[in-house]
Amino acid sequence: MAGLLLCGALLIGGCGGVLSPDLFIVQRSGNVPGAKLTMLVNEEGVVHCDNGPARRLSDPQIIEARTIQEDLEEPAAKHESLPAKPGSVLSYYLRDANGTVRFSDNSPHQPTAMRKLAGFVLNVAQGVCGLPQQGA
């Protein structure tokens, strides 16, 4: 009887569509057409752009997303916010389990991970989610 209960519990857990934890959510804003974007990326490589349908990242993109998230753990835990310089076009807000990060495309002293995040967001928005190029 105990074995049947265990098997039943395993079946229910497997059929319930267990949701993978989110790696991060990014909100991009700016003063050009198409700048506004919300992107949610989960641990299994599923991405949603602007609450659209679930899309699948490639394996290299999943690795890139995880690397970016890991590299931003410390800045997020410190709730790092880098001010924009005059002439900024795009701003980014990232939230993950560790905290938040804010920066703009021209914020001075950006760590490499922030520049990688901006590139990742652009590439995934256009290549995976099929969104038009911002400013177009």
Regions found by a protein language model. Give the residues of each.
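Post-signal peptide N-terminal segment of mature Sec-exported envelope proteins
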Residues: D22-E43
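Sec-dependent bacterial lipoprotein signal peptides
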Residues: M1-G13
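Acidic/histidine-rich, surface-exposed loop or edge segments in extracytoplasmic proteins
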Residues: N42-P53, V101
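A short, sequence-level motif marking secondary-structure junctions
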Residues: N42-G45, Q61-I62, D105-T112
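Short, well-ordered, aromatic-rich surface patches in folded extracellular/luminal domains
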Residues: G16-L23, Q27-S29, A77-A136
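Residue-level detector of buried hydrophobic side-chain packing
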Residues: V41, A65, Y92-L94
